[in-house]
């Protein structure tokens, strides 16, 4: 019985990092497809169009709920923090899985 538990633990140790890496790659792809055109593929922002998300203090401190709200509902010009960027952020419709992936990347991998 103990041997079986050890084998199961070793298999899990080998499989789960690969699953996490694959999910991370999927999250990056979701970000690039959904956000990259305006915010840059690496989150660096585009002058006059959209702010940088990498290193962005609000993104780092915002709750997942706040990020989800902005991503799915957008932001009108008067609600924006960046007055030098005239275009409002559009609302985005997507699956919960895609939304969670983008938020995970915004809060994690993008900030590294």
Predicted segments — roles?
Residues 44-72:
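Gly/Gly-Pro-rich "capping" loops immediately C-terminal to redox-active cysteine motifs
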Residues 47-54, 73-101, 106-112:
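Axial heme c-ligation environment in periplasmic c-type cytochrome domains
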Residues 30, 66, 98-101:
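Charged catalytic carboxylate motif
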Residues 23-44, 68-69:
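Sequence/structural segment immediately N-terminal to covalent heme-attachment motifs in c-type
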Residues 15-19:
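N-terminal signal peptide c-region/cleavage motif recognized by signal peptidases
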Residues 25, 61-62, 93-97:
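Soluble non-cytosolic domains of exported or imported proteins
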Residues 1-9:
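Bacterial N-terminal signal peptides that target proteins for export
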């Amino acid at each position: 019985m103990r041997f079986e538990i050890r084998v199961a633990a070793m298999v899990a140790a080998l499989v789960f990092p690969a699953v996490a890496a694959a999910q991370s790659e999927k999250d990056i792809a979701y970000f690039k497809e959904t956000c990259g055109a305006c915010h840059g593929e690496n989150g660096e922002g585009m002058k006059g169009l959209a702010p940088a998300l990498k290193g962005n203090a609000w993104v780092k401190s915002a709750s997942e709920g706040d990020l989800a709200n902005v991503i799915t509902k957008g932001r009108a010009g008067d609600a924006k923090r960046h007055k030098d960027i005239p275009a409002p952020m559009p609302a985005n419709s997507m699956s919960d899985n895609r939304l969670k992936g983008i938020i995970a990347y915004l809060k994690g991998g993008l900030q590294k």
